[in-house]
Regions:
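Class I S-adenosyl-L-methionine-dependent methyltransferase catalytic core
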Residues: 1-101
Length: 101
């Protein structure tokens, strides 16, 4: 997995081992962000629920979003590691919550 566009383009994203997390495929994220680009993502606030790897939030920040919140019960440390690797951790808030209740 990697970041598709923006300032962190090409940076690898780590995923947790096992089947608990199914990261959004690169091509799916690319399609979503191509649509969002037409609506303007620059300066936006992003909420990434069930964030897993943090790839969606990190992709948004890489493409100019002002701030992102990543919510995931198990993978907060991994999300932070990925965000630091992509140099967007200063604009990312991680909330370790279980939302399935």
């Amino acid at each position: 997995m990697r970041i598709i566009g923006g300032t962190a383009k090409g940076h690898a994203i780590k995923a947790p081992k096992g089947l608990d997390t199914r990261p959004t495929l690169d091509r799916v994220r690319e399609s979503v962000f191509n649509v969002l680009a037409n609506r303007g993502i620059f300066g936006s606030d992003i909420l990434d629920i069930f964030s897993g790897t943090g790839a969606v939030a990190i992709e948004a920040l890489s493409r100019g979003a002002a701030h992102a919140v990543a919510v995931d019960f198990k993978t907060g440390k991994l999300i932070l590691e990925n965000a630091k690797h992509c140099r967007v951790d200063d604009r990312l808030e991680i909330i370790p919550r279980k939302l399935s209740q």
